[in-house]
């Protein structure tokens, strides 16, 4: 899938933006806080029906405005045009349309335009709680497996209902608990099986990217832990019910799964330097891209936001070689350092566009300006 053109009104600090893109490489440079990340976030919104940074849609409306609109004009692999529209008004329901037809369920859109974003916020994958790492698995698997996404939605709905019963000050019949626990167990088993299969297939891809970027300097790994492994999830939920009532929430289940991120045999959270952490995250996301490309029927979009920060020159060079090659489709990349972008452009050749971003205004640079 190629994003040919985007139209943005009142999204974050972007008042009015109309841009035509290169099918290969699109570079955005400017100082921090000018709107580079917001432009990438608008592209992300068109794939995931939400912002990468702020899940509260109304807070993404430009200050002193009442709405935002994002429209993306795409071309599928077979040349078919696709138009995606998102509109949000304060105190109103978000509208999301494909070719002027509104989706009845936003989840039906997920995976239609596969996308991978690498950004400074990825540091939370290492530094943050286990929910960040579960979200990483969810974002990847949901883009190619509708059964997974449906099971995850069912599980989370049942979890909310069970937690409500656990907090109840009135006695609750066991049968009522069982209704939601059986739904959690059934959906949770699906989620567990698919997460386990994904991680097993993903690990060697991730390791190969890390070794390439680091030039074989360190070994990395991933291990997946779940209450569903080697036990009945339903029995675990029933057994934990007494403790859960005391706590007021569910202590067992696939919502507590963990993805351990290792440097050698130790947690990278404890052992990794800034450069190693950044290399780990970039390799993780590039492996995500490669996995989705192998699994799906269309090449994902790749968004690289300030990717070179905290990396030494040799690792920057390895990443430049990777993204300048033919393995990636359409790329959107931001940087405050024009030299980083120029080095990539030199390797890519002629199929690129360069944009200057300043105070929410984004302008394509002419050849003579470059």
Language-model-detected regions and their locations in the chain:
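Structural recognition of the conserved hydrophobic beta-strand(s) that form the central parallel beta-sheet
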Residues: 72, 330-337
């Amino acid at each position: 899938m190629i994003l040919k053109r985007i139209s943005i009104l009142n999204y974050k600090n972007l008042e009015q933006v109309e841009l035509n893109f290169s099918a290969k490489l699109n570079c955005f440079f400017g100082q921090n806080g000018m709107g580079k990340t917001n432009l990438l976030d608008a592209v992300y919104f068109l794939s995931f029906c939400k912002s990468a940074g702020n899940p509260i849609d109304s807070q993404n409306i430009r200050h002193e405005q009442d709405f935002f609109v994002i429209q993306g004009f795409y071309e599928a692999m077979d040349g078919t045009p696709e138009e995606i529209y998102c509109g949000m008004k304060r105190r109103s329901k978000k509208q999301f349309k494909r070719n002027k037809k509104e989706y009845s369920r936003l989840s039906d859109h997920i995976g239609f335009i596969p996308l991978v974003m690498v950004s400074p916020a990825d540091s939370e994958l290492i530094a943050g709680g286990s929910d960040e790492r579960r979200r990483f698995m969810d974002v990847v698997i949901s883009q190619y497996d509708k059964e997974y996404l449906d099971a995850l939605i069912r599980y989370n709905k049942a979890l909310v209902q069970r937690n409500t019963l656990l907090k109840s000050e009135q006695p609750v019949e066991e049968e009522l608990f069982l209704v939601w626990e059986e739904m959690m167990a059934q959906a949770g088993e699906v989620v567990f099986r698919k997460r386990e299969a994904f991680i097993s297939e993903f690990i060697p891809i991730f390791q190969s990217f890390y070794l390439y970027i680091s030039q074989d300097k360190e070994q990395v790994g991933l291990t997946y832990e779940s209450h569903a492994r080697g036990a009945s999830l339903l029995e675990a939920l029933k057994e934990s019910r007494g403790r859960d009532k005391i706590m007021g929430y569910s202590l067992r289940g696939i919502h507590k799964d963990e993805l351990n991120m290792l440097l050698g045999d130790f947690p990278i959270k404890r052992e990794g330097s800034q450069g190693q952490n950044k290399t780990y995250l970039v390799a993780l996301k590039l492996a995500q891209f490669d996995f989705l490309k192998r699994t799906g029927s269309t090449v994902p979009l790749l968004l690289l936001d300030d990717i070179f920060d905290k990396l030494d020159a040799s690792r920057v060079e390895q990443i430049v070689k990777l993204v300048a090659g033919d393995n990636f489709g359409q790329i959107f990349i931001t940087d405050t350092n024009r030299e980083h972008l120029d080095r990539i452009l030199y390797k890519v050749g002629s199929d690129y566009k360069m944009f200057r971003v300043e105070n929410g205004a984004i302008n394509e640079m002419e050849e003579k300006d470059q």
